[in-house]
Amino acid sequence: MPRLSEPSPYVEFDRKQWRALRMSTPLALTEEELIGLRGLGEQIDLLEVEEVYLPLARLIHLQVAARQRLFAATAEFLGEPQQNPGRPVPFIIGVAGSVAVGKSTTARVLQALLARWDHHTRVDLVTTDGFLYPNAELGRRNLMHRKGFPESYNRRALMRFVTSVKSGADYACAPVYSHLRYDTIPGAKHVVRHPDILILEGLNVLQTGPTLMVSDLFDFSLYVDARIQDIEQWYVSRFLAMRGTAFADPESHFHHYSALTDSKAIIAAREIWRSINRPNLVENILPTRPRATLVLRKDADHSINRLRLRKL
């Protein structure tokens, strides 16, 4: 049985308890497909998909159906005709967590699994990177050293985008970010057309504030968690690996790191982590963890072995 000690809004599971909740949910993902979804340095395998992600997909599938019934009940109470009866209200999922914790892989795997369920085959994934202010604007605001912190995002534009999707607009456009250029791409748009499910992935998507925030529009949210020292090690390892991949491209904003020796690269990575990523995690990202519907806790080997579900 899941662990229930003191009265709490959460119920905690180890992996064995959680995997039992898969029931008969089929695995509709191949090893080749998983390789394409796996991020640099991530260790996720099909066993973890079966034991962690399939129960999660089943839970979300059940909640999507329940949410649609709730919307229908509210419309009935208000005496309103059901708008676009063949087009359900989009179900919005937020995925949050630190840099290098693996939230992008989690979001991609979840997208692939949810799109294989009947009744919600249109599943879009948008990252909040595109809503960062362009570098020129960050420079004008003296925020380049705060890139990734909440104030470096155009939160009004992000709110307008999610509101448009949630309200059933025929389409909504999200700006596009280039990790190669380390900047938004002028004029580039990710067009979302009335999805059944929208997954919004980003560092600060669970932020709260004195006014309506994007997290207030979520129907379900995930926080990918791990010990801070483990995330730091994953960040450093990824930084070292990227010298031979993304950094090696002459067009990369970080091309100058590609020629660093291991020792110098480790020093550079730890300096970036300790001056930018760790403070952002501690000050802004980690405090939002209690707001998540489900927390996925990773061990040092990247495996998910503990989960905490919000039941209230």
Curated annotation (Swiss-Prot):
Q: Which NCBIfam families match?
A: panK_bact
Q: Which InterPro entries match?
A: P-loop_NTPase, PanK, PRK/URK
| Listed pathway(s) | Cofactor biosynthesis; coenzyme A biosynthesis; CoA from (R)-pantothenate: step 1/5
In terms of Pfam families, this protein maps to:
PRK
Biological process annotations from GO: coenzyme A biosynthetic process
Q: What is its EC number?
A: 2.7.1.33
Name of protein: Pantothenate kinase
- CDD domains in UniProt: PanK
Alphabetical list of Gene3D superfamilies matching this protein: P-loop containing nucleotide triphosphate hydrolases
Enzyme class (EC, first level):
transferase
